[in-house]
Design a protein with these regions (language model features):
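Conserved, charged catalytic cores of large soluble enzymes
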Residues: 25-26, 34-47, 60-64, 69-237, ...
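Function-dense linear segments that define catalytic or interfacial modules
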Residues: 1-33, 41-44, 55-58, 227-294
Length: 294
């Protein structure tokens, strides 16, 4: 698995992208041959995501192009579906939390210095009503107690202000760089059997990768609703229709098509390349600026 990140890094370095179906990796609840439980699909996807985020594609400012595909019957597919939703909620928490902390800590500091009491009394909430009020307000906003006390101690030492970095929701901001799942297009691979199970409101089995046994059974509609909500909330995962793709396969005897390139317009066999070409249509125009297409 780790060798894949090395090979991907080389491809990203020279301006190319990758698409990989990770469904052969065992789920987090599956056992290991040496005992214990697997760390699961998501732990490895997060390593690959971090590696991709560190590389500029082709030496430019563009991030690496990466498609991650997981089959709809994988034991960890629910966690995969919710991956970006959860991470973007972390961004929202970072943005809101950082601004609330900065606001309340500034007010605590101000209450320490703008008080009518003398000396140490300014830093004692039982003797400084303004400080008590700001501490209560900060606690109501869930500002960590250690930060509140830190500001009071700083104020005692004569500091008039405290630095507390805030974050924003710009896609290239520090908040987004902090969370995972931001360096790939994520897609689930669905079959006609799954779609029919959704239509007929049947159960759907998630299958262990090691022994082929049923890991968990859920309603297909519930899983489909999770996909719909995640796509609405964060635009991922995309959907690749495995049965349809392979029905249209031009070389079916050579094996299944399991994934696509990062933009998903090219689907073919494992370990094949998507070599794109372009034409300058201006060279096909005549003197009347009409295209000669015959």
């Amino acid at each position: 698995i780790m060798d894949l990140w090395v090979r991907e890094a080389r491809l990203f370095k020279y301006g190319s992208g990758t698409g990989t179906n990770f469904s052969n990796l065992r789920g987090g609840s599956e056992g290991l041959s040496g005992g214990g439980k697997s760390s699961g699909l998501m732990s490895f996807l997060k390593i690959g995501d971090r590696a991709a985020g560190a590389i500029k594609s082709g030496g430019t400012t563009r991030r690496a192009a990466k498609m991650v595909v997981v089959d709809i019957d994988h034991p960890d597919v629910e966690e995969f579906i919710k991956w970006k939703v959860t991470e973007e909620q972390k961004v929202a928490a970072l943005v809101t939390g950082s601004k609330l902390c900065a606001k309340h800590l500034k007010q605590v500091m101000s209450a320490c210095h703008n008080c009518e009491a003398d000396g140490e009394s300014c830093f004692d909430p039982s003797k400084n009503p303004a400080l008590k009020r700001e501490i209560i307000s900060a606690r109501k906003s869930e500002v960590p107690e250690n930060y509140i006390q830190r500001v009071i101690h700083f104020a005692k030492q004569g500091y008039k202000s405290i630095e507390f970095e805030t974050y924003d929701t710009d896609w290239d901001s520090e908040a987004y760089l902090t969370v995972s799942g931001q360096n790939s297009n994520n897609s689930i691979r669905v079959t006609d059997d799954f779609i029919n199970a959704v239509i007929e409101d049947k159960d759907w089995d998630l299958i262990n990768r090691t022994n082929g046994e049923v890991n968990k059974t859920i309603r297909a509609k519930e899983l489909w609703d999770e996909v719909g909500y995640a796509a609405w909330a964060c635009a991922d995962p995309g959907i690749q229709f495995h049965t349809t793709v392979n029905d249209w396969h031009t070389c079916p005897a050579s094996g299944e098509i399991k994934a696509s390139n990062p933009c998903s317009e090219y689907m073919f066999l494992d370990n094949t390349a998507c070599n794109l070409a372009s034409l300058n249509l201006m060279t096909f125009m005549d003197e009347n600026k009409s295209l000669e297409i015959d």
